Each structure stands twice: as structure tokens, then as C-alpha cells.
């Protein structure tokens, strides 16, 4: 490499001699057979030691390793690792460790036929395992688009996972970052359940000085330093687990003091991305969310906050909405060809609104209390308005439908009244009457701009699905 500096040197180094080829021979890229062999055999301590020894010598060497799970000289990946969590756990390590990840022929498709260099054609008529391919699309490929976070070693930190005073050698834990993007990876390469804490990284070598004054120092960083967190009671760390899509929140100060806790089932892997720190708001929402969630994840922190703030409102809304929506759906979508008369429909609507009166009054009273200083009609008045609107909608929907015009927009502009407008629009939106019935339930709040604040659209979707 010194004699021909512009040459890229690639090596296929087996028998666990990768370090020799990189350190002594100066190869730029080397097949890392230790990755495949040790992880396949679950020799986890050996492989963790190899990583720790490498970063103690020179972390930059990790960038030169080509990590793989199979190649033309080895059995296929599915033959060695299967198609379940162990395969995807090791594959996650492969694409999130520094270095160059390499997929073998047919690995993603789950092919089982081994191809040597002498093969000129396939002898098995194999088809891709679509479930395996789909899981790659969900678990693996999105992380590959984030390779800029994982590929380099400048911010790579490797951790021991401590549990009851000892290190669990079966869990791989490391963090990395690029710019303001951070990630933490955990994988338990054993069937047994495992848990523990990470706080301080394993030591790694750093070259300091220049010229003849260059020397190597051993350094270590905490997970809080690796994620650039603050030792502040008012700061919170928010992150997303890639595979499940769950969001988590932790106190930044707690991570600084204790580190990060992880509990993994056998062969379970978790990748935390979109890690960022926030300062608590005046209403202490992040503190309340952190205390309420108690470490568990949720799919949307904003929705979780809404559910906490509007718990009583949503309970009264659910009691009202679930008592009327199924009945309204039945009225607007009759299962028989025999259409009821207007008088019969009025009778059905009256029976429905009478049956839900208590739930309706309770909802409108509760919602008015939540509205605070917004001027709104009294609960009884809103209930009466709802009954009138619902009757009008049901009767309108029962009329002979309008013929769909060639130009709907032009026809809407020419509509002579509200009823004509609705009937014309319904030719392109069959669900319109049910949507308007929902509007009838919350009309006063929608008109006052409260429906969006209280996320009623989301709540209605829960009851329609």
C-alpha cells in the first residue's frame, strides 16, 4: 500500500486472519469471516472481544472489514442462520456495524442452493420467499438508507451490557452518529432472554499529536456523551424503535446518571433512531408523558398526550358516538331493497336520539367544560340541534339519488341550495352522509375550531374501523 498509494487492495482473508491482513499487509478491504462464523456459532464473547481488541488498536480498521453472512464458498445464509429472528438480528448487525455489508447471491430471496465459482447455472428451480423479502423491506432496507450513520467509526461507541455486576457477553450494543443524527443498536445473539444496562463505552484508541509527536491514547465515552444529552432535570430524550415503530421517552439526566436499560428476548434486536433531546414545556407534557408511560413505547407521543389531556372528554364522546354511529350507519345503508317511508325514518331517528339523550347531554356538558372561555350553546340546545340535523340528513339520503354529472365541479357551482349541493357531491362520495352525520354530532365544536384541537377526526376513525 505504501509503494503504490493509488491502488485499492482487496483481500479474501480466512482462518480468522483479517486483522493481520489489515494491520500488517495494509489491505483496504478484507472479508471478515469471523463475523459469519462466530455469530453463526454464537461465539459471542469471542466476536465482542475481536471488536474491542480492534478498536483498542485502531478503530479505523473496522471500516475496512467486509461483513457477510455467506459467500460463494460457504453455505447459503438461510442454511446457516435460518429465516427467523437470528437471521435478521445478525443481518441488522451486518448493516449497522462500521465497514462494508455484503449480501450473498439469493440471500434476500431465501435461496438454498449453494453456488461455487465453478457453477454456470442454477440446478434448482427456486422462487423467492416473499415473506422473507417483505421482512427485508420492513426491517433491513430502511436501515441501509441510513448507512451514513453507521459506516464510519469516528463516533462509534461499543458497550458492555452490565447485569447484576457482570457483563452479558451475548448482547451486542453500540451507538453511532453522523451530524445531528444518532442511533443505538442492541442485539441478543442467544435464545435466552437477556437484560442489562449500558453506560460507559469500551476503551478505544485515539491518535493525538502530529508528526514525530504522535501517540495513542485510550479513551471512553458515556452513552449520554455519545447521544449528546444534557445533565438537566428539564431535558428529555425521545427516540424511535425502528422495527416496531414505537416511540420512547426518557429523562436525559437519568441516562447521564444510570445509562440506558435494555431487555431483549432470545435473538431480539432493537435499533433506536430519530434520537433527539427536547426541553420540557410550560404544561410539563414531557415530564407527564415520561411518568405515565413508565418506559413503555407508544406509536405517537402527540396522540398519547391528547389521550391524557382529554381523557374525560374522550370517555363521554365514546359513550355517545358508539351509541349512535352504528345505528346511523344502518339507517343510511339499509340491507333491504324495501325503502322505509319518510314517516318511518322520522320515527327511527326519534327513537335513536331519545335512546342516546343521556350520553349526548353528558358529552356536550363535558365538552363545554373543556372549551373553557369559548362561547358555546348549552348542552340541551346542542342535543336538539343534533336531532334536527340528523333527521334532515337521513331523509335527504333516502331521497332518489342525483344523477352523476359529467362535470361535478360545474354542477356544484350551479347548485341552487344546500340540499342540491349535498346530493350532487354524494354522487362522487358515497360516504358523505355518514361524514355529515359525524359533523352533526360535533357541529358547535367544529364551527368554533375546537374539533381539530380535540382531534375528533381521529376519534371518529376509531369508531368507523
Where are these regions (language model features)?
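Active-site neighborhood of glycoside hydrolase catalytic domains
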Residues: 1-18
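Conserved protein kinase catalytic core
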Residues: 18, 76-77, 112
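Extended catalytic-interface subdomain
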Residues: 67, 71-75
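Short, acidic/polar
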Residues: 86-91
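Carbohydrate-interacting/catalytic domains
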Residues: 3-5, 23-31, 35-57, 63, ...
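A cross-family glycoside hydrolase active-site/sugar-binding cleft signature
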Residues: 10-12, 68, 104
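Active-site beta-loop-alpha junctions enriched in small/polar residues
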Residues: 12-16, 71, 108
Amino acid at each position: 500500500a505504501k509503494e503504490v498509494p493509488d491502488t485499492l487492495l482487496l483481500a479474501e482473508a480466512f482462518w480468522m486472519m483479517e486483522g493481520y491482513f489489515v494491520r500488517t499487509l495494509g489491505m483496504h478491504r478484507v472479508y471478515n469471516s469471523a463475523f459469519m462464523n462466530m455469530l453463526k456459532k454464537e461465539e459471542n464473547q469471542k466476536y465482542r472481544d475481536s471488536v474491542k481488541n480492534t478498536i483498542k488498536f485502531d478503530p479505523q480498521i473496522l471500516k475496512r472489514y467486509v461483513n457477510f453472512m455467506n459467500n460463494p464458498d460457504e453455505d447459503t445464509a438461510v442454511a446457516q442462520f435460518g429465516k427467523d429472528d437470528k437471521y435478521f438480528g445478525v443481518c441488522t448487525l451486518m448493516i449497522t456495524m462500521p465497514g462494508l455489508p455484503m449480501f450473498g447471491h439469493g440471500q434476500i430471496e431465501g435461496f438454498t442452493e449453494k453456488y461455487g465459482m465453478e457453477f454456470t447455472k442454477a440446478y434448482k428451480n427456486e422462487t423467492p420467499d416473499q415473506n422473507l423479502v417483505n421482512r427485508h423491506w420492513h426491517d433491513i432496507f430502511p436501515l441501509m438508507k441510513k448507512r451514513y450513520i453507521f459506516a464510519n467509526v469516528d463516533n462509534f461507541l461499543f458497550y458492555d451490557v452490565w447485569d447484576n455486576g457482570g457483563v452479558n457477553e451475548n448482547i451486542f450494543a453500540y451507538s453511532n452518529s453522523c451530524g445531528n443524527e444518532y442511533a443505538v443498536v442492541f442485539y441478543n445473539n442467544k435464545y435466552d432472554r437477556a437484560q442489562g444496562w449500558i453506560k460507559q463505552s469500551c476503551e478505544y484508541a485515539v491518535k493525538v499529536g502530529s508528526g514525530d509527536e504522535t501517540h495513542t491514547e485510550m479513551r471512553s465515552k458515556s452513552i449520554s456523551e455519545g447521544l449528546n444529552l444534557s445533565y438537566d432535570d428539564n431535558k428529555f430524550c425521545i427516540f424511535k424503535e425502528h422495527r416496531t415503530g414505537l416511540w420512547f421517552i426518557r429523562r436525559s439526566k437519568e441516562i447521564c446518571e444510570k445509562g440506558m436499560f435494555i431487555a431483549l428476548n432470545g435473538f431480539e434486536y432493537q435499533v433506536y433512531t430519530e434520537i433527539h433531546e427536547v426541553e420540557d414545556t410550560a404544561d410539563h407534557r414531557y415530564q407527564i408523558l415520561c411518568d405515565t408511560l413508565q418506559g413503555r413505547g407508544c406509536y405517537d407521543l402527540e396522540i398519547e398526550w391528547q389521550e391524557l389531556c382529554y381523557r374525560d372528554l374522550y370517555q363521554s364522546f365514546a359513550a355517545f358516538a358508539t351509541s349512535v354511529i352504528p345505528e346511523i350507519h344502518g339507517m343510511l345503508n339499509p340491507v333491504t331493497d324495501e325503502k322505509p317511508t319518510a314517516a318511518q325514518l322520522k320515527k327511527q331517528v326519534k327513537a335513536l336520539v331519545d335512546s342516546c339523550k343521556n350520553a349526548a347531554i353528558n358529552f356536550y356538558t363535558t365538552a363545554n367544560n373543556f372549551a373553557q372561555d369559548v362561547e358555546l350553546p348549552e348542552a340541551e340546545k346542542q342535543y336538539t340541534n343534533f336531532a334536527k340535523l340528523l333527521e334532515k340528513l337521513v331523509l335527504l339520503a333516502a331521497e332518489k339519488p342525483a344523477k352523476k354529472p359529467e362535470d361535478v365541479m360545474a354542477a356544484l357551482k350551479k347548485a341552487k341550495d344546500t340540499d342540491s349541493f349535498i346530493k350532487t357531491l354524494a354522487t362522487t362520495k358515497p360516504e358523505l352522509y355518514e361524514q355529515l352525520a359525524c359533523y352533526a354530532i360535533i357541529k358547535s365544536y367544529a364551527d368554533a375550531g375546537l374539533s381539530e384541537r380535540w382531534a375528533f377526526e381521529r376519534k371518529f376513525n376509531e369508531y368507523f374501523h
